[in-house]
C-alpha cells in the first residue's frame, strides 16, 4: 500500500509514477473523494459534540425539574443526522480503502521505461552457452528417454499442467531442493522455516495477490476463506504480519521450500508442453525483512544469493531489470534471473528478485522499532526464488545432455545423488 500521507499530499506525483506502469490513476477524482471524507469526518465530529452537549443539558435540566422533552427531541434529530453522516463516511472510507488496495507500488527511478518484456534491460550475463555438436533434445524428450517423467499419468490423476517424477529424476528434484536449502542456510545466513500451504485472504491481501489477482488462485471449496499458496512469499512474508520487530532482531532472512499452486488463468496456450508452466510446482523461496535504509543493498545481496545457485550448478544465465510495464504489482524494482535452455534457444525466467519497499509492510502492518525514535515504523520486505526447482531441473537436463540422451549430474549435486554422476546408465 502506498503511504497514505504521500497519496494525500501529492496524488498527481503518484499518478505520474504509476503511469510508467501503464496504470491510470485519477488524481483529481481521488482529491475529491478524500475531501469528501474529510468533510464527513468533520461533520460527524461536530454532530457527536452536539449530541454530547445536549445530553449533558438534559441531565442538568432534569436536576432542575425542567421539561426535557424538547432537548430529547433535539438529541434524536442530531442522532439521526449523525447516523446518516456516519453511514456516508463509512461508504466513502470503503471506496478509499478499495482504491488504496488497487494501487500498485511506486516504481523506483532506476526501473527502465517500457511496455512489456521486450523493453526489459539486460544487466549482465554469466556462463558460456554450451556449444553442442548435436541438435539438443528438450526436457520432455529427455525425460521420456531417461524414464521417470510422466505427463500422461499426471493427466489421469489431476489433469493438464501436472507431472509425475520417479526414480533418478525424482531424486534429482529432491537433490536440487536440498542443495539450495543447504547453500542458503549455511553460506547466506538464512533461517529455514516451515509454513502452511493454505493461506487466508488477509495474508494474500498483505502481500498483494488480493484483491487484484484472485483469478490466478486456487480457492478451497470446502472453506472459501482459504486458498492454496501461489508462492511461499505469501506465508513467509506474513510471519511478520501485525508484528513489531525489535531493532536487535533485524534484518530477518527466511528460506522456505514449498509447493506452489497457480491456476495460470491468463496463460491459456502458453508453454503447454513440459514442466515450464504448471499448476503445481516447487520453489525454494528467499524472504528478507530489513530496515528501510538497507533494502536496496539487500536486493543486490538477495539477487546474488539466487545467482550463486546457478553458478554452483554451472548453468548459463542472465540478469534482467524489468521495465515499468512488465514489473509485478507490489514491486518497486525487480531483477529476473533467466537461465539458458538449449532446446528453446532462449533464456527463460527461473527467479524474480524484488524489493517491495514498505508497500507490503503497510498492508501487513509489519513494523520495526526505530531505536532513534523508539517508535514503530514500516519495515521493507524483499523476496526472490532461490530457485524454482522444476525449472532448474529442466535447465540441468537440457544443458547437461549428451548426444545419446544421457545427462551428466552437475558436480555440486553429486553428493546429494549418492555419488551418481550420469543419468541414463
From Swiss-Prot:
PROSITE patterns given in the database record: AA_TRNA_LIGASE_II
GO cellular component: cytoplasm
Enzyme Commission numbers on file: 6.1.1.11
One GO term (biological process): selenocysteine biosynthetic process
Extent of Basic and acidic residues compositional bias: 51-65
InterPro entries: aa-tRNA-synt_IIb (IPR002314), aa-tRNA-synth_II (IPR006195), aa-tRNA-synth_II/BPL/LPL (IPR045864), Ser-tRNA-ligase_type_1 (IPR002317), Ser-tRNA-synth_1_N (IPR015866), SerRS_1_N_sf (IPR042103), SerRS_core (IPR033729), tRNA-bd_arm (IPR010978)
Reactions mediated catalytically: tRNA(Ser) + L-serine + ATP = L-seryl-tRNA(Ser) + AMP + diphosphate + H(+); tRNA(Sec) + L-serine + ATP = L-seryl-tRNA(Sec) + AMP + diphosphate + H(+)
Pathway(s): Aminoacyl-tRNA biosynthesis; selenocysteinyl-tRNA(Sec) biosynthesis; L-seryl-tRNA(Sec) from L-serine and tRNA(Sec): step 1/1
Pfam families found in the cross-reference section: Seryl_tRNA_N (PF02403), tRNA-synt_2b (PF00587)
Top-rank taxon, per record: Bacteria
Keyword Ligase: yes
EC primary class: ligase
UniProt-annotated binding residues for L-serine: 231-233, 285, 385
Location(s) in or outside the cell: Cytoplasm
Record text about domains: Consists of two distinct domains, a catalytic core and a N-terminal extension that is involved in tRNA binding.
Subunit structure: Homodimer. The tRNA molecule binds across the dimer.
Similarity comment: family membership: Belongs to the class-II aminoacyl-tRNA synthetase family. Type-1 seryl-tRNA synthetase subfamily.
Name of the featured protein: Serine--tRNA ligase
Lineage: Bacteria, Pseudomonadati, Pseudomonadota, Gammaproteobacteria, Chromatiales
Amino acid at each position: 500500500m502506498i503511504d497514505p500521507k504521500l497519496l494525500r499530499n501529492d496524488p498527481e506525483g503518484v499518478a505520474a509514477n504509476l503511469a510508467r506502469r501503464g496504470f491510470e490513476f485519477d488524481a483529481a477524482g481521488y482529491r475529491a473523494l478524500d475531501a469528501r471524507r474529510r468533510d464527513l469526518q468533520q461533520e460527524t465530529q461536530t454532530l457527536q459534540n452536539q449530541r454530547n452537549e445536549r445530553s449533558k443539558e438534559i441531565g442538568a435540566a432534569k436536576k432542575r425539574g425542567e421539561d426535557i422533552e424538547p432537548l430529547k427531541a433535539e438529541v434524536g434529530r442530531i442522532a439521526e443526522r449523525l447516523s446518516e453522516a456516519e453511514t456516508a463516511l463509512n461508504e466513502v472510507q470503503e471506496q478509499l480503502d478499495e482504491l488504496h488496495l488497487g494501487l500498485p507500488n511506486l516504481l523506483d527511478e532506476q526501473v527502465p521505461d517500457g511496455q512489456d518484456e521486450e523493453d526489459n534491460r539486460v544487466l549482465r550475463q554469466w556462463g558460456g552457452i554450451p556449444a553442442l555438436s548435436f541438435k539438443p533434445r528438450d526436457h520432455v524428450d529427455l525425460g521420456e528417454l531417461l524414464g521417470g517423467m510422466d505427463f500422461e499419468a499426471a493427466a489421469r490423476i489431476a489433469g493438464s499442467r501436472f507431472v509425475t517424477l520417479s526414480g533418478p529424476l525424482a531424486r534429482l528434484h529432491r537433490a536440487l531442493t536440498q542443495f539450495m536449502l543447504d547453500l542458503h542456510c549455511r553460506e547466506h545466513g538464512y533461517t529455514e522455516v516451515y509454513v502452511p500451504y493454505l493461506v487466508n485472504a488477509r495474508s494474500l491481501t498483505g502481500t498483494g495477490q488480493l484483491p487484484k489477482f484472485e483469478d490466478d488462485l486456487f480457492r478451497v471449496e470446502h472453506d472459501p476463506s482459504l486458498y492454496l499458496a501461489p508462492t511461499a512469499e505469501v506465508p513467509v512474508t506474513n510471519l511478520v504480519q501485525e508484528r513489531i520487530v525489535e531493532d536487535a532482531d533485524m534484518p530477518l532472512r527466511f528460506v522456505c521450500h514449498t509447493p506452489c499452486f497457480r491456476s495460470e488463468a491468463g496463460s491459456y496456450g502458453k508453454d503447454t508442453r513440459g514442466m515450464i508452466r504448471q499448476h503445481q510446482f516447487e520453489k525454494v523461496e528467499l524472504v528478507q525483512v530489513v530496515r528501510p535504509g538497507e533494502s536496496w543493498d539487500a536486493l543486490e545481496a538477495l539477487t546474488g544469493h539466487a545467482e550463486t545457485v546457478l553458478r554452483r550448478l554451472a548453468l548459463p544465465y542472465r540478469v534482467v531489470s524489468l521495465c515499468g510495464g512488465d514489473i509485478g504489482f507490489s514491486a518497486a524494482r525487480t531483477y529476473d534471473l533467466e537461465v539458458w535452455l538449449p532446446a528453446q534457444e532462449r533464456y527463460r525466467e527461473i527467479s524474480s528478485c524484488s524489493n517491495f519497499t514498505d508497500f507490503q509492510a503497510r498492508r501487513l502492518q509489519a513494523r520495526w522499532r526505530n531505536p532513534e525514535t523508539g517508535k514503530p515504523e514500516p519495515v521493507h520486505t524483499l523476496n526472490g526464488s532461490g530457485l524454482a526447482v522444476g525449472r532448474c531441473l529442466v535447465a540441468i537436463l537440457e544443458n547437461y545432455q549428451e548426444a545419446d540422451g544421457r545427462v551428466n549430474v552437475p558436480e555440486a549435486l553429486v553428493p546429494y545423488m549418492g555419488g551418481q554422476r550420469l543419468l541414463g546408465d
